[in-house]
Amino acid sequence: MARESRESTTLDSHSAEDQMELLVIKVEQEESSPLAEETSWLGSPGPDRSRQRFRAFRYPEAAGPRQALSRLRELCRQWLRPDMHSKEQILELLVLEQFLTILPGELQAWVREQHPDSGEEVVALLEYLDRQLDDTPPQVPDDDDGQELLCSKAVLLTSAQGSESSQMEPVEPLLKQESLGSLPSEVRVTHVGHCGEDGVTATRLTSELQGLLKMEDVAPVLSPRWTEQDSSQMNLYKDGMQEHSGSLVSLDQDMQTKVRDLPRAEEYRDQKPEQTVCFLGEDTVPIPTGAEASEQEGKLQAAQKSATGTRRFYCRECGKSFAQSSGLSKHKRIHTGLKPYECEECGKAFIGSSALIIHQRVHTGEKPYECEECGKAFSHSSDLIKHQRTHTGEKPYECDDCGKTFTQSCSLLEHHRIHTGEKPYQCNMCPKAFRRSSHLLRHQRTHTGDKDFFVPEPYWESQSRVESHWENIETPVSYQCNDCERSFSRITSLIEHQKVHTGEKPFECQTCGKGFTRPSYLIQHQRRHTGKKTSVTVTPAVHSEVGVQLSLN
C-alpha cells in the first residue's frame, strides 16, 4: 500500500514537472513567435494579442498567489485599457469577445482575420459573407472559372485556419482524410496576402498537417443552403473539385521567401489596388481595380449599413467622417471656400444656412434664448450658457498655474498671459504692448484724443490688421497749444497745459478748499492734512471740462 502511494506521488510529481516543462516551452514559443517580435517592435501588444495573453495566463507561471493576481490585473489592463476606454467601450470589447467565441471554429477564425471593432461589424461581415456565398450556385466549375471558384472557397477556409494558429489557440482539424481521397497529397495554398477587395486573406494550407477537404464538414459552415443539396449534387461538386485540384500547387522556395516579405493584411488598406496580385499555381490573377473594385466596396458598405443602420462618409482632404452625406457636403466648403448663403441686409456670406440664420438676428434683434432665472434674452445659445453661470456660480475653466477659475474660456486665455508675459496687442505709434485689446484701445485714445473710438476685439487678433488700420488713420504728429505754440505728443498733456493759461483748478481740497490743476498736486497737498499715505478721492470742479475722477490707494 505504501509502495503504491509512493508510486502515485512520484507520478504526480513527474506529471507536474511535465506540465511545467510544457508551460515553459509554450511561453518560450510565445516569446519567440513573429507576433511577439512584432509587438515588441511596436512597443505595446495589440488588442488581440493582449486578450490572448490574458486568457492564456496560468497560475504556475507566477511565483505566488499575490504575484498571479497582480499579473492578471496587469494583463487585463493591457487588454481593456481602462485609461483610454469608457465603460461602454469595455463592455463592447467583452461582448465582442464572447460573440466571436460562440461562432463556429472556421468562421470565427475568418472573422478574426478582419479585425472587427464591434459586434455590429461582425454581424455585417457574416451577413455579407452569407449573401456572397448564396449568389454562387453549387455547380461544376468550368475550365475558365474553376480555379477562381476553388481558390475563393479554399481561401475562406484556410484563412480561418491560419488565423487560429497565429493566435496560439487550439485548432480543430478543418480538413480530413475521409473523402476526396484522390486529391494529391502535395496540394496546398501558399499565403500570398490579399485576395480581393472584400478583405479575404489566404493563408498557407498544408495537407500533411491538416488532412484533405471534407465537403460534409465545411458546407454547413459556409452557408445553410449547402445542407439542402442531395448526395448526387454533392458528389458532382466533389468530382469537379478533384478535377481542378491540380491547379492548386505549391510555389517554390524562392517564391515563398518573396511572399513572406509581402505586407500583412492590415497594411493592404494603404496599398494601391494595382500593386496587389493573387498567385494561383503558375497563373497570376490581378485584383479587381477601378469600377469593379468600387462596386465590391459599395456592396460591403451597403452590407454594413443594413446591419448596423449607420454609414460613414469620409472627407478626402482631412479624413473627417460624417454620418450623413449632407454633413460631408457642408464640410467640403471649408476646403473650397464656397459660401453660398448670403445675407440680404449686409451682403456677408456664410458656409451653412444655420450660420446665416444666427447672423440675421443681428439685423432683426431677435433673441430666442431667454434665461429662466432673470428673464434676460440672448441671440445665441452659447451666450445663454455663459450667462447662466452667473446664477449657478459655475467656473469650469481653471488655470493650471495658480488654480484660479473662470466662467469663460476667453477669460482663461487672457489670464494665462499674466503667467507667460505675452502681450500680443502692440501699439503702432509707440513701443507699448498690452495683454488685452481693450487696454490697447484705451491707450490709443491718448494718441488720437477720440473718446468714442472703438474697434471690436476679434479685429485685433491679427497684428497685420492692426498695422494696416493705423496706417489709414491720419493723426497729427503733435498737439500744439494755441496760446504759446508749445507742442505735446499726447492730447491729455495739452489739456493739462491749457489750464495754466485759463487758470482753471478743477481739483479742490475738501479740507481747506484749495484748488489744483493736476490730481497729483492735490494728493501731495492732502498728505499735509493727514500726515500719512491714505486713500484719497479726487473730485474735479463742477465746471471742469476734463471731468476726471480717480481713486488712489
Curated annotation (Swiss-Prot):
It comes from the Eukaryota. Its main location: nucleus. A zinc finger (C2H2-type) spans 313-335, 341-363, 369-391, 397-419, 425-447, 479-501, 507-529. GO terms for molecular function: chromatin binding; DNA binding; DNA-binding transcription factor activity; sequence-specific DNA binding; zinc ion binding. Keywords: Activator, Autophagy, Cytoplasm, DNA-binding, Isopeptide bond, Metal-binding, Nucleus, Phosphoprotein, Repeat, Repressor, Transcription, Transcription regulation, Ubl conjugation, Zinc, Zinc-finger. There is a cross-link at residue 176 (Glycyl lysine isopeptide (Lys-Gly) (interchain with G-Cter in SUMO2)). Gene3D superfamilies: 6.10.140.140, Classic Zinc Finger, DNA breaking-rejoining enzymes. It is found in: Nucleus; Cytoplasm. One of its GO terms (biological process) is negative regulation of autophagy. The modification Phosphothreonine is found at residues 136, 206, 448. Expressed in heart, brain, spleen, lung, liver, skeletal muscle, kidney and testis. The modification Phosphoserine is found at residues 33, 44, 223. SMART domains: KRAB, SCAN, ZnF_C2H2. Residues 28-49 are annotated as: Disordered. Residues 213-273 form the KRAB domain. The keyword tRNA processing does not apply. GO terms for cellular component: cytoplasm; nucleus. Residues 51-133 form the SCAN box domain. Coiled coil: none annotated. Transcriptional factor that binds to the consensus sequence 5'-[GT][AG][AGT]GGGG-3' and acts as a repressor of autophagy. Specifically represses expression of genes involved in autophagy and lysosome biogenesis/function such as MAP1LC3B, ULK1 or WIPI2. Associates with chromatin at the ITGB4 and VEGF promoters. PANTHER family: ZINC FINGER PROTEIN (PTHR24393), ZINC FINGER PROTEIN-RELATED (PTHR24393:SF100). Belongs to the krueppel C2H2-type zinc-finger protein family. This is Zinc finger protein with KRAB and SCAN domains 3. The lineage of its organism: Eukaryota, Metazoa, Chordata, Craniata, Vertebrata.
